[in-house]
Amino acid sequence: MHSLQAKILDPRLGSDFPLPQYATPGSAGLDLRAMLKEDSVLGPGQTLLIPTGLSIYIADPGLAALVLPRSGLGHKHGIVLGNLVGLIDSDYQGELMVSCWNRGESPFTIAVGERIAQLVLVPVVQAHFELVEAFDESQRGAGGFGHSGSH
């Protein structure tokens, strides 16, 4: 297991509400909570930037973190991430914030301390551009959207 530096920015985290943790031994994501001052109603089409009460420092440039939606919130209630996926760079040290968007048709109440997203560590491979005049030919070539076949 990889070590991850974290700072608690909201004293309710770790006392009133559990610290981010893996739900099962096979879980890929750590649950992030809505550390709001009070419950908040998110109307249809609205977005809200939600603090998690936590900052992390990954430090290792070979890693990054992704903030991903919780599948149940999206499927059952239409609550997804406003930016679809959040990318946390290894050198970022600020508070983790979650942009929530209600794409559903009904208002949804986000409760204080509710699990709203998950944090997943992923490997990163940085690349440098090698400028060329032409590419070696491939089977696909420049075929774009829908080029590889239907369904």
UniProtKB/Swiss-Prot annotation:
Keyword field contains Magnesium: yes
Main EC class the enzyme belongs to: hydrolase
UniProt cofactor(s): Mg(2+)
Pathway assigned to this chain's UniProt record: Pyrimidine metabolism; dUMP biosynthesis; dUMP from dCTP (dUTP route): step 2/2
GO cellular component: cytosol
Gene Ontology molecular function, alphabetical: dUTP diphosphatase activity; magnesium ion binding
GO BP of this protein: dUMP biosynthetic process; dUTP catabolic process
Catalytic reaction(s) noted: dUTP + H2O = dUMP + diphosphate + H(+)
This protein's UniProt keywords: Hydrolase, Magnesium, Metal-binding, Nucleotide metabolism
Sequence positions that bind substrate: 70-72, 83, 87-89, 97
The UniProt record lists the keyword Amino-acid biosynthesis: no
Pfam family of the protein (one): dUTPase
UniProt-listed Enzyme Commission number(s): 3.6.1.23
Family: Belongs to the dUTPase family.
Protein purpose: This enzyme is involved in nucleotide metabolism: it produces dUMP, the immediate precursor of thymidine nucleotides and it decreases the intracellular concentration of dUTP so that uracil cannot be incorporated into DNA.
PANTHER family: DEOXYURIDINE 5'-TRIPHOSPHATE NUCLEOTIDOHYDROLASE (PTHR11241:SF0)
Name the record gives this protein: Deoxyuridine 5'-triphosphate nucleotidohydrolase
